[in-house]
């Protein structure tokens, strides 16, 4: 503890280094005597600083506070004005500023010109192409770097080298930024025209990326990669990331496999010592050399040299450097293009008639058959979800934009909003709600567009379709996904699997007579050629399905779905171009439909099957696996002879030729040892993930507050670190300090302490120890947690007003009426709460809540008031358990090989000792009998929180709950009277606790919690049958042991003698655990 607080104090004296600056620490304690000393100390500090007296004497006088109480926050004030950054920066700006080459990029605006050249007037200016979209500023980032540099200028040995490397790189950034002056941001952290007009347009986003890169430099190789990317990304804003990461798709095919992990019948990873040689035809090397040439043409020197050097022996030992280059390339920032260019990208592909009609027919038929296969069971059995598809759609309607702003009346309040949920309510109130009519998206009503930006790829457009499309597609797509869940081919959806399972699937069949074909089909998904066969395949499938049932409601659902496909075959889009809005006929498929993911997966599976059926005419092979994962598909083919160079080359050329016959511009590769797809890559029998999450630039702006973004920043840092890209932790902590500070007045700021930001409360931002989620059990920790719980949820006047309006109330009661067969307060309240929560995405409401939150927080950070909360948190449970455990040293041998080389040492060690897991632990209650029973008769999906509440009710209340949701009385009676009900109690509690303990997030998702090696370190004498208590004791012990091992790199064993008398008490408590939502949990969820 305390590293953060120490840095915070140093940071404050670095930032506010004038005579007028004062730092006042604020302490608190759960001990009432000490607490009164804390209050006394604080008021005397204020008194002294008002009178300009030193605080030193007080620090001595109140030593007991400083020693024994807990730091709550630091209050700092300074009358210093802004030019501080510029002054400090000048010291580092000793180098030659970079000059942008203004001819590198094809599109004029992607060249890093002076802003006024790209946008001659303020009216024409937009920051959308360079907006870092993050609630922290360039000046803060510069400050954070300079703080780190100043703090480390006296480092020695290896640390000194790191300092010099970073200093050298920062000199480039500082000199360039200093030449033009630091751009000042406005209150919303945006950079306006008058600030930017005389500066290079991409200066800010480039500087942010560069700072992120230079603060991730440790070794000499890091330095070389970073220097090259920093210098070149100043000019090349379009293709740099793509150029640098392209070779990876070939590199994975060059490394021999010497021992790997494969999936066994039990879906676990097991080691296999097989040896598979990489067989690489000359053609492949030629392609690789072409890529390296392209890199050199773009001015890259060191990076292609590193790759070239690695090629001499292609060893897996040195492969992590290749992985590093691949990850680093993403950190040059997002490529943000104008919407017009993004849309035209799909349209400028020449439409040729010269295609293989036969293949198209086969492709369409495969899509048709798959759609039928997915839906035939629910359709034949007149599934209630397909009958009540409209209601199901309404219940899960999102609060995203509906494409146009409308004036809406809620009671006396009139507001403007674009949100779907509000439009639905308004339409219902005014009789305009007609879900049976799917509005056209033709030339009269073109589709408004959203955007998706990603590093190293072109900007993609997203359809913002009217909500009718969502309602029409929701239920059918849900059924498709249920089918995909138990179909291994759909890697993305396969039941509770994680990426390690997919890894073991690929390596399993690799051998000297097999090859793997992997294709990136992202170009195909958005191509015009895909549109007709794709939509027609779906339509034909729906026609077949409609003949399988006589239920009018099911037929209506299928017809509406079909109508969305027909409408979208003739789609027009509207694109703002300057002041005019262009209408363009858009023949391609774009994201934005509910079906996007599911339908693309179906199409990509159909595509690879079509291709394989073609090449099977020429070769004899067995298809061992076919997988589709998002934009990528891959298949392992087993031949009856050993694979030779010539075979690989022939198959490769035939596959490409086959794709070409469908005019599919895709990147198809064949290898014998590895694959590379968007989500993961396999090389030398080991699995790698791209650590490419940008920290200081974001894709888009959302409803997030600064606190939320600080948590997201930390969460991104953790994910990158697990994947092999490490940013300096002190720098991340400094960013958290900056982003979580709260301004009281112009010169007064409050900085929360580590305890506030890491305690498991509604304000949690990060973990005090990376990878370890701590649940504080000391008096002070529980005290502060209680204090924060008292101000957790804030009211919003606007939201209350909307919720009180008849429009809103009628909508809720309409939903409840359609859903419920009899009164059910839990569900009705639940729906009302969900709908009210959706209002949060309406900016004025989230702003209002945020202001209330901040002011409550300000009070709390200056003096915590606890109110005696009767709520029990997971901390209370663990606090009760902890005293009964005794620990002693233990030893576990390393017994598994490494298969994920990028993991940090301490995490790697644990996997090598206890093994990894290839599945997600069920934490939403969906496997419980009650959840299955409800979904059998109702479209309502209770959350894990609701199930947890319901399952602990009296039996007759559970019966009423079930009956009100339309479950027949006989089924409800049977359920409550059976053993299943008591099993469910345990099962749901288990899920709920797993959910609270974030067992599927961070690095915990990698560990096998059921490992026998872990179990044997725990001894808990069995006393009486309370499975729930046994469960929590074991889980606590496992987490303690794992956390200890992460921290110390050694093992302990735990013995617990839990008194029987306490067990029943604990069991009762376990039914009242409150879940805490925080920016931290939100960021974890956001990672998903």
Curated annotation (Swiss-Prot):
UniProt KW RNA-binding keyword: yes
Main location: virion
Cofactor needs: Mg(2+)
GO BP terms in the entry: DNA-templated transcription; viral genome replication
Gene3D superfamilies, per the entry: 1.10.357.80, 1.20.120.1390, 3.30.230.140, 3.30.70.2480, Viral RNA-directed RNA polymerase, 4-helical domain
Organism of origin: Rotavirus A (strain RVA/Human/Philippines/L26/1987/G12P1B[4]) (RV-A)
Database matches in InterPro entries: DNA/RNA_pol_sf, RNA-dir_pol_4-hel_dom, RNA-dir_pol_luteovirus, RNA-dir_pol_reovirus, Rotavirus_VP1_C
UniProt-recorded name of the protein: RNA-directed RNA polymerase
Family the entry assigns: Belongs to the reoviridae RNA-directed RNA polymerase family.
RdRp catalytic domain residues: 501-687
Enzyme class: transferase
Compartments reported by the entry: Virion
EC number: 2.7.7.48
Subunit record text: Interacts with VP3 (Potential). Interacts with VP2; this interaction activates VP1. Interacts with NSP5; this interaction is probably necessary for the formation of functional virus factories. Interacts with NSP2; this interaction is weak.
Keyword annotations: Magnesium, Nucleotide-binding, Nucleotidyltransferase, RNA-binding, RNA-directed RNA polymerase, Transferase, Viral RNA replication, Virion
Function: RNA-directed RNA polymerase that is involved in both transcription and genome replication. Together with VP3 capping enzyme, forms an enzyme complex positioned near the channels situated at each of the five-fold vertices of the core. Following infection, the outermost layer of the virus is lost, leaving a double-layered particle (DLP) made up of the core and VP6 shell. VP1 then catalyzes the transcription of fully conservative plus-strand genomic RNAs that are extruded through the DLP's channels into the cytoplasm where they function as mRNAs for translation of viral proteins.
Source superkingdom: Viruses
Annotated GO MF terms: nucleotide binding; RNA binding; RNA-directed RNA polymerase activity
Catalytic activity: RNA(n) + a ribonucleoside 5'-triphosphate = RNA(n+1) + diphosphate
CC per GO annotation: virion component
């Amino acid at each position: 503890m305390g590293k953060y607080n120490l840095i915070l104090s140093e940071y404050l004296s670095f930032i506010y280094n004038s005579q007028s600056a004062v730092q006042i620490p604020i302490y608190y304690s759960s001990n009432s005597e000490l607490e009164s000393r804390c209050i006394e100390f604080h008021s005397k500090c204020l008194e002294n600083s008002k009178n300009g007296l030193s605080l030193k004497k007080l620090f001595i006088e109140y030593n007991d506070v400083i020693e024994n109480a807990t730091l709550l926050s630091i209050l700092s004030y300074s009358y210093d004005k802004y030019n501080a950054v510029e002054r400090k920066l000048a010291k580092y700006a000793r180098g030659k500023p970079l000059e942008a080459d203004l001819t590198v990029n094809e599109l004029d605006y992607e060249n890093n010109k002076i802003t006024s050249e790209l946008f001659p007037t303020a009216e024409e200016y937009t920051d959308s192409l360079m907006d870092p979209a993050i609630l922290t500023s360039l000046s803060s980032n510069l400050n954070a770097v300079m703080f780190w540099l100043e703090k480390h200028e006296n480092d020695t040995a290896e640390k000194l080298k790191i300092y010099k490397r970073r200093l050298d790189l920062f000199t480039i950034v500082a000199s360039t930024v200093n030449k033009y002056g630091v751009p000042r941001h406005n209150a919303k952290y945006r950079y306006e025209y008058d600030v930017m007009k005389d500066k290079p347009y991409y200066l800010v986003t480039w500087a942010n990326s560069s700072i992120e890169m230079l603060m991730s430099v440790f070794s000499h190789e890091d330095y070389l990669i970073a220097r090259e990317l920093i210098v070149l990304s100043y000019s090349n804003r379009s293709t740099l990331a793509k150029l640098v990461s392209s070779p990876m798709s070939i590199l994975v095919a060059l490394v021999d496999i010497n021992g790997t992990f494969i999936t066994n019948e039990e879906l676990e990873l097991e080691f296999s010592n097989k040896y598979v040689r990489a067989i690489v035809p000359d053609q492949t090397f030629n392609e690789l050399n072409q890529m390296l040439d392209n890199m050199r043409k773009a001015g890259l020197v060191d990076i292609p040299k590193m790759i070239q050097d690695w090629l001499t022996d292609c060893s897996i030992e040195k492969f992590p450097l290749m992985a590093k280059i691949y990850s680093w390339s993403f950190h040059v920032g997002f490529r943000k293009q104008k919407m017009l260019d993004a849309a035209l990208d799909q349209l400028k592909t020449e439409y040729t008639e010269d295609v293989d009609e036969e293949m198209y027919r086969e492709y369409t038929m495969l899509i048709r058959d798959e759609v039928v296969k997915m839906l035939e069971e629910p359709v034949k059995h007149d599934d209630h979800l397909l009958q009540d598809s409209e209601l199901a759609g309404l219940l899960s309607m999102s609060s995203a934009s509906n494409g146009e702003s409308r004036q809406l009346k809620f009671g006396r309040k009139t507001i403007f909003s674009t949100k779907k949920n509000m439009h639905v309510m308004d339409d219902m109130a005014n009789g305009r709600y007609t879900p049976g009519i799917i509005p056209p998206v033709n030339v009269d009503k073109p589709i408004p567009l959203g955007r998706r930006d990603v590093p190293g790829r072109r900007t993609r457009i997203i359809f913002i379709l009217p909500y009718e499309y969502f309602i029409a597609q929701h239920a059918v797509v849900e059924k498709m996904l249920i089918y995909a869940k138990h179909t291994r081919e759909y890697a993305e959806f396969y039941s509770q699997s994680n990426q390690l399972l997919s890894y073991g699937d690929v390596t399993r069949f690799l051998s000297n007579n097999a090859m793997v074909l992997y294709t990136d089909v992202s170009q195909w998904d958005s191509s015009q050629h895909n549109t007709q066969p794709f939509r027609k395949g779906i339509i034909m499938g729906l026609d077949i399905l409609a003949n399988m049932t006589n239920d009018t409601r099911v037929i209506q659902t299928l017809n509406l779905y079909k109508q969305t496909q027909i409408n979208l075959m003739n789609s027009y889009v509207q694109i703002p171009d300057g002041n005019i809005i262009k209408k363009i006929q858009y023949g391609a498929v774009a994201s934005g439909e509910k079906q996007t993911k599911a339908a693309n997966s179906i199409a990509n599976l159909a595509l690879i099957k079509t291709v394989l059926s073609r090449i099977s005419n020429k070769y004899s092979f067995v298809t061992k696996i076919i997988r589709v994962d998002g934009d990528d598909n891959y298949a392992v083919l087993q031949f009856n002879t050993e694979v030779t160079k010539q075979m690989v080359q022939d198959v490769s050329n035939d596959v490409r030729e086959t794709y070409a016959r469908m005019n599919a511009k895709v990147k198809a590769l064949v290898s014998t040892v590895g694959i590379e797809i968007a989500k993961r890559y396999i090389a030398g029998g080991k699995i790698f993930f791209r650590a490419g999450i940008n920290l200081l630039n974001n894709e888009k702006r959302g409803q997030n507050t600064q606190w939320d973004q600080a948590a997201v920043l930390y969460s991104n840092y953790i994910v990158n670190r697990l994947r092999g890209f490490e940013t300096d932790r002190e720098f991340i902590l400094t960013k958290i300090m900056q982003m979580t500070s709260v301004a009281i007045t112009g010169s007064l700021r409050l900085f929360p302490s580590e305890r506030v930001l890491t305690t498991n409360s509604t304000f949690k931002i990060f973990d005090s120890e990376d990878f370890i989620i701590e649940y504080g059990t000391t008096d002070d920790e529980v005290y502060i947690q209680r204090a924060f719980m008292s101000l957790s949820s804030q009211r919003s006047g606007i939201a209350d007003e909307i919720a009180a309006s008849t429009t809103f109330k009628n909508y809720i009661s309409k939903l409840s009426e359609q859903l419920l067969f009899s009164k059910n307060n839990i569900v009705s309240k639940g729906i009302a709460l969900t709908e009210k929560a959706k209002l949060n995405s309406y900016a004025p409401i989230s702003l209002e809540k945020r202001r209330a939150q901040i002011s409550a927080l300000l009070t709390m950070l200056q003096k915590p008031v606890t109110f005696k909360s009767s709520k029990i948190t997971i901390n209370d449970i663990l606090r009760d358990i902890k005293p009964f455990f005794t620990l002693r040293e233990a030893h576990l041998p390393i017994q598994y090989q490494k298969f994920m080389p990028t993991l940090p040492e301490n995490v790697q060690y644990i996997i090598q000792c206890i093994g990894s897991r290839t599945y997600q632990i069920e934490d939403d209650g969906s496997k419980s009998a009650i959840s299955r029973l409800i979904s059998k008769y109702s479209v309502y999906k209770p959350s894990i929180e609701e199930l947890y509440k319901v399952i602990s009710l009296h039996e007759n209340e559970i019966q009423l709950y079930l009956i009100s949701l339309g479950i027949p009385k006989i089924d409800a009676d049977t359920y409550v009277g059976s053993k299943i009900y008591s099993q469910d109690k345990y099962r749901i509690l288990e899920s709920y606790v797993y959910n609270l303990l974030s067992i599927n997030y961070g690095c915990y998702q990698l560990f096998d919690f059921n490992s026998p090696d872990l179990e044997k370190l725990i001894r808990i004498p069995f006393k009486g049958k309370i499975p729930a208590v046994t469960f929590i004791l074991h889980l606590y012990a496992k987490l303690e042991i794992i956390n200890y091992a992460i921290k110390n790199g050694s093992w302990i064993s735990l013995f617990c003698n839990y008194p029987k008398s306490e067990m029943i008490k604990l069991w009762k408590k376990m039914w009242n655990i409150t879940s805490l939502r925080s920016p931290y949990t939100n960021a974890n969820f956001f990672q998903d």
